[in-house]
Amino acid sequence: MSNKDWTGNTNSIFKTLGASNHTEKERQNEDYYATDPEAINKLITKYQLPEVIYEPCCGEGHLAKRLMKLGHTVIATDLIDRGFGKGGVDFLKVNKMPENCKCILTNPPYKIALQIILHALEILPEDGECIMFLKTTFLEGKKRFQELYSKCPPVKIYQFSERVMCAKNGDFETMIKGGGSAVSYLFMIFKPHNKNLPTIDWI
Protein backbone atom coordinates (compact mmCIF):
# COMPACT_ATOMS: atom_id res chain seq x y z
CA MET A 1 0.00 0.00 0.00
CA SER A 2 1.47 3.36 -0.97
CA ASN A 3 1.59 6.41 1.26
CA LYS A 4 -0.05 9.14 -0.72
CA ASP A 5 -2.25 12.15 -0.57
CA TRP A 6 -5.12 12.20 -3.03
CA THR A 7 -4.32 13.97 -6.28
CA GLY A 8 -7.02 12.50 -8.48
CA ASN A 9 -9.63 14.11 -10.68
CA THR A 10 -11.68 16.39 -8.45
CA ASN A 11 -14.18 16.98 -11.22
CA SER A 12 -15.16 13.30 -11.33
CA ILE A 13 -15.88 13.06 -7.61
CA PHE A 14 -16.98 16.56 -6.73
CA LYS A 15 -18.37 17.73 -10.06
CA THR A 16 -21.67 18.97 -8.64
CA LEU A 17 -20.02 21.27 -6.11
CA GLY A 18 -20.85 24.93 -6.37
CA ALA A 19 -18.61 27.76 -5.32
CA SER A 20 -18.47 28.16 -1.55
CA ASN A 21 -19.77 31.46 -0.27
CA HIS A 22 -17.66 33.93 1.67
CA THR A 23 -19.57 33.48 4.93
CA GLU A 24 -18.86 29.74 5.01
CA LYS A 25 -15.16 30.34 4.46
CA GLU A 26 -14.99 32.98 7.18
CA ARG A 27 -16.81 30.68 9.58
CA GLN A 28 -14.44 27.77 9.08
CA ASN A 29 -11.36 29.96 9.01
CA GLU A 30 -12.26 31.18 12.51
CA ASP A 31 -13.06 27.64 13.67
CA TYR A 32 -9.80 25.94 12.68
CA TYR A 33 -8.13 23.90 15.39
CA ALA A 34 -5.33 21.57 14.33
CA THR A 35 -5.30 18.19 16.05
CA ASP A 36 -2.23 16.64 17.62
CA PRO A 37 -1.44 13.48 15.56
CA GLU A 38 -1.06 11.66 18.87
CA ALA A 39 -4.86 11.34 18.74
CA ILE A 40 -4.45 8.83 15.89
CA ASN A 41 -1.75 6.95 17.79
CA LYS A 42 -4.16 6.52 20.70
CA LEU A 43 -7.10 5.48 18.52
CA ILE A 44 -5.26 2.69 16.73
CA THR A 45 -4.44 0.99 20.03
CA LYS A 46 -8.13 0.05 20.25
CA TYR A 47 -9.60 0.38 16.76
CA GLN A 48 -8.46 -0.89 13.36
CA LEU A 49 -8.76 1.71 10.64
CA PRO A 50 -9.47 0.78 7.00
CA GLU A 51 -6.92 1.17 4.24
CA VAL A 52 -8.56 4.12 2.47
CA ILE A 53 -9.77 7.15 4.44
CA TYR A 54 -11.46 10.41 3.41
CA GLU A 55 -10.41 13.42 5.53
CA PRO A 56 -12.79 16.26 4.49
CA CYS A 57 -11.62 18.92 6.99
CA CYS A 58 -7.91 18.28 6.65
CA GLY A 59 -6.55 21.70 7.60
CA GLU A 60 -2.77 21.56 7.34
CA GLY A 61 -2.85 17.76 7.32
CA HIS A 62 -1.97 16.91 10.91
CA LEU A 63 -4.22 13.84 11.06
CA ALA A 64 -3.87 12.92 7.39
CA LYS A 65 -0.08 12.94 7.47
CA ARG A 66 -0.04 10.64 10.47
CA LEU A 67 -2.45 8.26 8.73
CA MET A 68 -0.27 8.29 5.62
CA LYS A 69 2.80 7.41 7.67
CA LEU A 70 0.86 4.44 8.98
CA GLY A 71 0.33 3.27 5.41
CA HIS A 72 -3.19 4.50 4.71
CA THR A 73 -4.29 6.12 1.48
CA VAL A 74 -5.82 9.47 2.45
CA ILE A 75 -8.16 11.59 0.35
CA ALA A 76 -7.69 15.02 1.91
CA THR A 77 -9.87 18.07 1.21
CA ASP A 78 -10.92 21.25 2.99
CA LEU A 79 -13.06 24.29 2.35
CA ILE A 80 -10.05 26.49 3.14
CA ASP A 81 -6.77 25.90 1.30
CA ARG A 82 -4.12 25.64 4.01
CA GLY A 83 -1.43 24.15 1.80
CA PHE A 84 -2.40 20.50 2.15
CA GLY A 85 -4.84 18.35 0.21
CA LYS A 86 -7.45 19.84 -2.12
CA GLY A 87 -8.75 23.25 -1.05
CA GLY A 88 -12.06 24.84 -1.98
CA VAL A 89 -14.14 21.71 -1.34
CA ASP A 90 -17.21 22.23 0.84
CA PHE A 91 -17.90 18.80 2.32
CA LEU A 92 -21.54 19.67 2.96
CA LYS A 93 -21.97 19.88 -0.83
CA VAL A 94 -20.13 16.65 -1.66
CA ASN A 95 -22.71 14.15 -2.93
CA LYS A 96 -20.75 10.90 -3.02
CA MET A 97 -17.76 9.18 -1.49
CA PRO A 98 -14.43 8.94 -3.28
CA GLU A 99 -13.92 5.70 -5.19
CA ASN A 100 -13.04 2.64 -3.07
CA CYS A 101 -13.47 4.61 0.15
CA LYS A 102 -15.90 3.70 2.93
CA CYS A 103 -14.50 5.70 5.83
CA ILE A 104 -14.63 9.37 6.81
CA LEU A 105 -12.30 10.50 9.59
CA THR A 106 -11.92 14.12 10.64
CA ASN A 107 -11.92 16.76 13.34
CA PRO A 108 -14.85 18.84 12.06
CA PRO A 109 -15.31 22.55 12.79
CA TYR A 110 -17.22 22.40 16.07
CA LYS A 111 -19.92 24.87 15.03
CA ILE A 112 -21.02 22.65 12.15
CA ALA A 113 -19.97 19.26 13.49
CA LEU A 114 -23.55 18.01 13.70
CA GLN A 115 -24.23 18.92 10.06
CA ILE A 116 -21.00 17.25 8.98
CA ILE A 117 -21.83 14.00 10.79
CA LEU A 118 -25.37 13.92 9.40
CA HIS A 119 -24.08 14.55 5.89
CA ALA A 120 -21.37 11.92 6.25
CA LEU A 121 -24.00 9.35 7.21
CA GLU A 122 -25.99 10.30 4.10
CA ILE A 123 -23.18 9.71 1.62
CA LEU A 124 -21.48 6.73 3.27
CA PRO A 125 -22.31 3.24 1.98
CA GLU A 126 -24.26 0.90 4.23
CA ASP A 127 -21.07 -0.71 5.51
CA GLY A 128 -19.20 2.58 5.86
CA GLU A 129 -18.02 4.33 9.00
CA CYS A 130 -17.76 7.91 10.20
CA ILE A 131 -14.99 8.57 12.74
CA MET A 132 -15.19 11.98 14.39
CA PHE A 133 -12.77 13.68 16.78
CA LEU A 134 -14.95 15.85 19.03
CA LYS A 135 -15.12 17.65 22.33
CA THR A 136 -16.55 15.42 25.05
CA THR A 137 -19.31 18.00 25.52
CA PHE A 138 -20.62 17.00 22.08
CA LEU A 139 -22.31 14.10 23.88
CA GLU A 140 -24.89 16.47 25.32
CA GLY A 141 -27.44 18.72 23.65
CA LYS A 142 -31.13 18.50 22.85
CA LYS A 143 -30.68 19.17 19.13
CA ARG A 144 -27.93 16.56 18.79
CA PHE A 145 -30.08 14.00 20.58
CA GLN A 146 -33.15 14.73 18.47
CA GLU A 147 -31.40 14.87 15.10
CA LEU A 148 -28.60 12.34 15.60
CA TYR A 149 -28.34 10.21 18.74
CA SER A 150 -32.01 9.20 18.91
CA LYS A 151 -31.91 8.11 15.25
CA CYS A 152 -28.37 6.86 14.73
CA PRO A 153 -26.27 6.68 17.90
CA PRO A 154 -22.52 6.11 17.67
CA VAL A 155 -21.45 2.47 17.75
CA LYS A 156 -18.32 3.25 19.74
CA ILE A 157 -17.04 6.07 21.91
CA TYR A 158 -13.35 6.33 22.73
CA GLN A 159 -12.70 8.84 25.50
CA PHE A 160 -9.15 10.15 25.86
CA SER A 161 -7.76 9.47 29.33
CA GLU A 162 -5.29 12.33 28.89
CA ARG A 163 -5.79 15.73 27.34
CA VAL A 164 -5.11 16.03 23.62
CA MET A 165 -3.92 19.33 22.18
CA CYS A 166 -5.97 21.11 19.52
CA ALA A 167 -4.20 24.31 18.60
CA LYS A 168 -6.04 27.26 17.07
CA ASN A 169 -4.71 27.93 13.57
CA GLY A 170 -2.16 25.14 14.14
CA ASP A 171 -0.12 27.14 16.66
CA PHE A 172 0.99 24.31 18.96
CA GLU A 173 4.01 26.24 20.24
CA THR A 174 1.85 28.95 21.80
CA MET A 175 -0.48 26.33 23.23
CA ILE A 176 2.37 24.44 24.88
CA LYS A 177 3.75 27.67 26.34
CA GLY A 178 0.29 28.37 27.73
CA GLY A 179 0.14 25.07 29.58
CA GLY A 180 -1.38 22.73 27.00
CA SER A 181 -5.01 21.72 26.66
CA ALA A 182 -7.82 22.29 29.15
CA VAL A 183 -10.43 20.61 26.94
CA SER A 184 -11.56 16.97 27.00
CA TYR A 185 -11.90 15.12 23.68
CA LEU A 186 -13.13 11.79 22.35
CA PHE A 187 -13.60 9.85 19.14
CA MET A 188 -17.12 8.88 18.12
CA ILE A 189 -17.62 6.19 15.49
CA PHE A 190 -20.90 6.14 13.59
CA LYS A 191 -22.28 3.67 11.07
CA PRO A 192 -25.27 4.41 8.82
CA HIS A 193 -28.65 3.29 10.22
CA ASN A 194 -27.21 1.97 13.48
CA LYS A 195 -29.83 1.64 16.22
CA ASN A 196 -27.77 -0.01 18.96
CA LEU A 197 -26.42 1.91 21.93
CA PRO A 198 -22.67 2.59 21.92
CA THR A 199 -19.90 0.87 23.81
CA ILE A 200 -17.36 3.12 25.53
CA ASP A 201 -13.68 2.65 26.14
CA TRP A 202 -10.72 4.81 27.10
CA ILE A 203 -7.65 5.53 25.02
Residues of each region from the PLM?
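Class I S-adenosyl-L-methionine-dependent methyltransferase catalytic core
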Residues: 1-203
